[in-house]
């Protein structure tokens, strides 16, 4: 993945990330679902919501700083450290859930990650996730690229924002059947007069 996290600031100032993820939880078909993996669980907020719904849930993240917060806040939940592009479960699960994670993973690593997810699921299991898509924050990244160029530097885009068609093709190549996928606008109001600079410092 592309990011070293300030886990405490992320938790205190950017709660909108996991708050938006609550809507994604509603896409899970709960019929017969028992075991859930929250892939890229971060501070564990949505992992806890899944547990509150009665699922047996495990949170997985590559950031030890994030996992420390998750374990402190939700000691009754199992959290394990592993990279999304190279993980394996002892037993497959009914659902792999993920919120606001996959756009952090380089395009070249996406197929390997999706293969890990596919192997982690029981036959007929569900893969329910949200990620940034094509055009996301394009004005910010264009402005940063112009600014870097003005000073003689090249701006390296830190995210992978695919189209629905591109990503559906990746999923199908691994073996998934895509039942529902949508690209939508989601304006986010940032906090305070330094909201944009704080966002850039955290995520870029």
Language-model segments: what does each one mean?
Residues 1-34, 45, 49, 128-150:
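Conserved class I S-adenosyl-L-methionine
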Residues 37-39, 43-86:
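Class I SAM-dependent methyltransferase SAM/SAH-binding core
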Residues 88-96:
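A short acidic, Gly/Pro-enriched loop at the edge of an enzyme's catalytic core
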Residues 95-109:
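A short SAM/SAH-binding and catalytic strip from SAM-dependent methyltransferases
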Residues 111-126:
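A short glycine-rich, Lys/Arg-flanked "PGG" loop and its adjoining helix->strand segment in the class I
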Residues 160-174:
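Short alpha-helix
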Residues 179-204:
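C-terminal helical/coil "lid" or tail adjacent to the Rossmann-like core of SAM-dependent
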């Amino acid at each position: 993945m592309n990011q070293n996290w300030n886990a405490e600031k992320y938790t205190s100032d950017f709660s909108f990330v996991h708050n938006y993820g609550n809507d994604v939880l509603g896409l899970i078909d709960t019929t017969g679902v028992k075991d859930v993996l929250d892939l890229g669980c971060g501070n564990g907020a949505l992992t806890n919501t899944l547990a509150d719904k009665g699922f047996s849930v495990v949170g997985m993240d590559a950031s030890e700083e994030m996992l420390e917060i998750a374990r402190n806040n939700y000691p009754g939940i199992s959290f394990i450290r592993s990279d999304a592009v190279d993980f394996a479960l002892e037993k497959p699960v009914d659902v792999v859930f993920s919120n606001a994670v996959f756009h952090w993973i380089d395009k070249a690593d996406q197929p390997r990650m999706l293969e890990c997810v596919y192997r982690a699921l029981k036959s007929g299991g569900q893969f329910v996730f949200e990620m940034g898509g094509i055009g996301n924050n394009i004005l910010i990244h264009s402005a940063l690229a112009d600014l870097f160029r003005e000073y003689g530097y090249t701006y390296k885009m830190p995210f992978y924002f695919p189209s629905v068609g591109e990503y559906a093709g990746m999923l199908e190549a691994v073996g998934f059947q895509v039942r529902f996928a949508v690209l939508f606008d989601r304006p986010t109001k940032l906090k305070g007069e330094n909201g944009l600079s704080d966002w850039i410092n955290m995520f870029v």
